[in-house]
Amino acid sequence: MTKEKWFKLVNKEYSQIDQEWQWTYLLLIPFIFNEQVIHKITITDHWKEKHKDIITNEKILELVRKLNKEVMKPEPKKKPAWPDVFVPRGIEYQNKRFLLVFWFERSSSDWLWIRDCYPN
């Protein structure tokens, strides 16, 4: 039995503004987070600064899959202008727990921006 493909890489670019690599994926199956249908996910390379030996984009995508149909509250804002940031803790993958840091990109309700991932 083959695993259903959830994501398709549609863009890989280096952002001069953010000084980081960014990979954008389209969702190939219905994916819902906070009662919103998600169509795109962008992963930044911020995780490579400290966790390149244990984190990969593929692992992040597997963790994101586990958020399908989840509803969660954002973290308290540190600055009013910042987006609502979500930090689910303890997402299990291969008998280990991980933490993701992400938000809805550009106030979009269908695009998640994954900023970081690390062991929890």
Question: What function would you assign to each model-found segment?
Answer:
Residues 1-120:
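Ribonuclease/tRNase effector modules and their secretory precursors
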